[in-house]
Curated annotation (Swiss-Prot):
GO MF annotation list: L-seryl-tRNA(Sec) selenium transferase activity
Alphabetized InterPro entries for the sequence: PyrdxlP-dep_Trfase, PyrdxlP-dep_Trfase_major, SelA-like, SelA_trans
Key words, A-Z: Cytoplasm, Protein biosynthesis, Pyridoxal phosphate, Selenium, Transferase
Protein's name in the database: L-seryl-tRNA(Sec) selenium transferase
N6-(pyridoxal phosphate)lysine carried by residues: K221
UniProt enzyme class: transferase
Underlying gene: selA
Reaction it catalyzes: L-seryl-tRNA(Sec) + selenophosphate + H(+) = L-selenocysteinyl-tRNA(Sec) + phosphate
Entry EC number(s): 2.9.1.1
Length: 386
């Protein structure tokens, strides 16, 4: 039977992704492309980005010596100066960082990790570690892990004491205690900051001050940058990762490196046009004012409209809630258009809301004034056609 030939139609040539209005409860969500730049920030970096994208560049050639150089060298110097770390490595996301560390340094060896740090959210850290070729030795329970649990787990196959950032543990073992234990037994102490509390830049600096063997985190969320995983730590450990064949599979290209440089530069200078910082530093009063503005635009429409307290969250970061407000709507004529149909029609127009108890809810946390106007126009159009 002959295979059907797929024709190249105009629809296939349309831009595959389009901008959306994120009125959902999830900020920097995987489904929405995670972090994004502010317009002001993009306008600042656009000339340099254009230069990198439209010309050959010195990615791996040293213009001073005419020899080959490491593509990470310029960024390495900036990271070292900024965070006082011995060495860094950049891979395509933090999951890659975790996998590379486990595969390169603990192949067929044991990683000792608290059971409670492997659960929560949508991201299955346990599967990543098991598929790396390392073995897991779980200690503690869902919300408690004591130092004695780690000590009792030690054996001749132990290689890494692994800790994942989890501020909601009821009984947490301080990382510095794990470091002491690791040094006593010549093990690697590894701290996975992952999607750390993004409103608190001190978290990274506090862990770095402890000088862990290895540390990794998500650059796109921490620096509001392109998706990347940053590995920092002891030169010996990072060099072992860099020389591993898997690193070449996971390394990043010139666009990611350029965007990461620009984002880190802005982060160092505390620039206010970093989207993450602007959103996460919103006051409760500012969020209420946003809700009132959207309420005023929607009230004249054929809708029941109200404001309610709510919570947003950062992507799939478990347990981190952001106080906010939502504007709840319900069509007055539910026979012609119920809330489920309205939710779907909004979704099809690129307005991502949520539905709860027969109401469509617009979370205001990620919205701006242009979004309010667009939501009102889309709703008016939908109601007129109902």
């Amino acid at each position: 039977m002959a295979k059907e030939t797929l024709e190249i139609t105009p629809d296939l040539l349309k831009n595959p992704y389009q901008k959306i209005i994120n009125a959902s409860a999830s900020v920097f969500d995987e489904k929405h492309g995670r972090s994004f730049f502010s317009t002001q920030f993009y306008e600042k970096i656009e000339p340099y980005l254009k230069e990198v994208l439209t010309h050959p560049i010195d990615l791996e050639c040293d213009l001073n010596t005419a020899k080959k150089k490491n593509r990470l060298t310029p960024l390495k110097q900036l990271f070292k100066a900024c965070f006082n770390t011995e060495e860094i490595l950049i891979v395509n996301n933090n999951t890659s960082a975790i996998f590379l560390i486990a595969n390169a340094l603990a192949q067929e060896k044991e990683i000792i990790v608290s059971y409670g740090e492997l659960v929560g959210g949508d991201f299955n850290l346990k599967d990543i570690l098991l598929n790396s070729g390392a073995r897991l030795h779980l200690v503690g329970n869902i919300n408690r892990a004591y130092l004695r649990d780690y000590r009792l787990a030690l054996n001749e196959n132990s290689k890494i004491l692994f800790k994942t950032h989890n501020p909601h543990f009821k009984k947490d073992t301080p990382f510095k205690d794990l470091q002491t234990l690791a040094k006593e037994h010549d093990l690697i102490d590894y701290y996975n900051l992952g999607d750390v509390d993004l409103s608190n830049r001190v978290a990274l600096e506090e862990i770095l001050a402890l000088k862990p063997s290895l540390l990794s985190f998500s650059a796109d969320k921490f620096f509001n940058s392109a998706q990347a995983g940053i590995i920092m730590g002891q030169k010996e450990r990072v060099e072992a990762l860099k020389n591993h064949p898997l690193y070449r599979v996971l390394r990043v290209g010139k666009i990611t490196l350029t965007l990461l440089f620009c984002s880190l530069k802005a982060w160092i200078n505390h620039q206010e046009d970093i989207t993450i910082h602007a959103l996460l530093n919103q006051t409760k009063d500012a969020l209420l004012q946003k809700a009132l503005k959207l309420y005023a635009l929607l009230k004249p429409l054929e809708l029941n409209v109200s404001i309610a307290s709510s919570f947003s969250k950062i992507g799939n970061l478990f347990g981190r809630e952001l106080e906010s407000f939502c504007v709840k709507i319900q069509p007055k004529n539910t026979r012609a258009l119920n809330s489920e149909k309205l939710y779907l029609k909004l979704f099809q127009k690129g307005v991502i809301a949520r539905i709860s108890c027969e109401f469509v809810c617009f979370e205001v946390f990620s919205l701006n004034e242009k979004d309010f106007e667009k939501i009102a126009l889309v709703l008016e159009e939908i109601l007129n056609k109902a």
